[in-house]
Every structure is written in C-alpha cells, then in structure tokens.
A protein has these predicted regions:
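N-terminal secretory signal peptides that target proteins for export/translocation
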Residues: 1-5, 41-42
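Sec-dependent N-terminal signal peptides of Gram-positive bacterial secreted proteins and lipoproteins
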Residues: 4-26
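Low-complexity, acidic Ser/Thr/Pro-rich repeat tracts that form intrinsically disordered stalk/linker regions
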Residues: 24-87
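Glycine-rich repeat segments that build the extracellular carbohydrate-interaction surface of secreted
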Residues: 75, 84-101, 111-116
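Extracellular beta-strand-rich solenoid/capping regions of secreted or surface-exposed proteins
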Residues: 100-112, 120-149, 153-165, 171, ...
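All-beta strand scaffolds that present successive hydrophobic residues in beta-strands
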Residues: 112-115, 136-141, 174, 198-206, ...
C-alpha cells in the first residue's frame, strides 16, 4: 500500500513539473516578454527531441507574429511596405532597409512611418506619399547616424535650378532616414502630397523631390470632396534641395495649415 502511494505521488509530482514547463512559453507570450526558445539536448531521433523541436517551432511562430500583434511591422521591400500601410492592425511601420517604389504610397488611416536611417526612393514620376483626407501620417527616424550622399547640382528639368540627387559620390551628406526622388513631371507635391489629411514630421529628411507647379517637398491641398484641408505639423526633420515653380520646400494652399515648431 505504501509503495502504491509513493508511485502515485511520484507520478503526480512529475505531471506537475511537466505542466509547469509547458506553461512557461504561454505565460511569457501573454506578457509580451518572450525569451529565446528552449533547445533540446536529446538525440535527434528521441521523442523528447521531437517535442522540443515542435515547441521551438511554435515559439518561432510567436516571434514572427509578435511585431504585428504589438502593432509594429518591419518591412524591407516595396510590396511589404504597401501591404503594411493597408493593414489597419499595424500602427508603426519601420524600414529595415532602403526601399524603392515605382508608384505612390497612399495613406488613408492613422499610421507612423519610421525611416530608421534608410532611404525611401521613388523611381517613378509621382509623389512618394499621398496622405488622403482620412489619413494621419507621422514620419519619424530612430536612426540619425546613417549617412547618405547627394549631388547638390542636379538641374531640375523644368526650371533648370539646382536640386539635390542621391549620388554615392555626392559632396553633400544627409544623416538619418531620407525620402527622395518624388515628383518628376507631376504638378504638385513631389515628396508628400497632403490631400486633406494630416502630416506630422518628427524626423527624417525629404531631399531632392520636385514638382512642375507647387510644393517640391510637401504640398498641402484642400480636398473638395470631403471638405477637409491639409495640415502639416513639423516638429523635426528637414526638407532639403527640393524644387518647384512655387514652394520648392513646402506649398500651403488656401485653407490649409502649416505649423513649424522645429526642423529645417
């Protein structure tokens, strides 16, 4: 009888230990403080090793999903950036690398774009970003040390004035994240076209963007369809070497608002 009791309590103790070990990753996931997945020291063919590999696979899946679950997404391609802007569960988008786009990025919700020291370059002939009437975009830059070089004597094709162009052999250095290349032959808002929405610039630089008419860097427009006026709040960052017939840096259309606290 005593031996049976001993076996019973031993089995109960083992079960408790197993349950405790299994529950640890779940508890960590709930608190958002995942640690590195445990590794198995058993042989590759053992049941314990298979179980450990399955647990590691589950945790790796949690790691991959965690940034989106927290509302943060890192992107490294144009497609990833476009998809992230369309995903309302993502509130902060961080560039992991330089990204080239060929069509305008549209913002129609509240979202933050962290340039993270990288270059967002338009290779087409339109605005880099359009903030629509329902859009509220914040541009920030957590990495202000990465350096990019520009040629400051690129002649803008329509007005033949100096405009900065990204150039690995350029003489001008811009530190931190950069939005560049926008505009081409389009009329307004080469860097960012704010069509009734709100743009807050807290960091980064808009460099070498152009427009045939107004707002080489940023153009603030009134959206007649919604009755909303464009708003630009600048609390940091820079607009450099942009070109347009009117407002090479920023053009403010009637009924729109530009408030500048800091920045250049």
């Amino acid at each position: 009888m005593k031996k049976q009791k001993i076996r019973f309590y031993a089995a109960l103790l083992c079960s408790s230990m197993v349950l405790s070990l299994v529950s640890m990753p779940v508890s960590a996931a709930e608190t958002g403080q995942l640690t590195n997945p445990p590794t198995s020291t058993e042989g590759p063919g053992s049941p314990e090793s298979a179980s450990g590999n399955e647990a590691a696979a589950v945790l790796n899946g949690l790691y991959a999903a965690l940034p989106v679950a927290n509302g943060v997404k890192e992107v490294a391609t144009a497609d990833e950036l476009t998809d992230a802007l369309a995903d309302s569960s993502i509130s902060i988008i961080t560039l992991k690398d330089d990204v080239e786009i060929s069509s305008t990025l549209t913002v129609n919700r509240t979202v933050t774009l962290d340039l993270n020291g990288n270059v967002l370059k338009m290779t087409g002939s339109d605005s880099v970003i359009k903030v629509e009437a329902d859009g509220d975009l914040t541009i920030q830059d957590r990495n202000t040390t990465t350096q990019h070089t520009f040629n400051p004597h690129c002649k803008y094709q329509f007005w033949y004035i100096d405009m900065w162009e990204l150039d690995k052999d350029g003489s001008k250095i811009v530190s931190g994240g950069v939005i560049t290349g926008g505009g081409g032959d389009q009329n307004n808002g080469g860097g960012v076209l704010v069509a009734g929405g709100t743009l807050t610039m807290a960091g980064g630089s808009i460099v070498g963007c152009s427009a045939r008419s107004r707002g080489g860097g940023v153009y603030l427009a009134y959206d007649s369809a919604t009755g909303k006026s464009g708003t630009f709040i600048m609390t940091g960052g820079s607009i450099i070497g942009c070109a347009a017939q009117l407002g090479g840096g920023v053009y403010v259309a009637p009924e729109c608002t530009f408030a500048m606290a800091t920045g250049s």
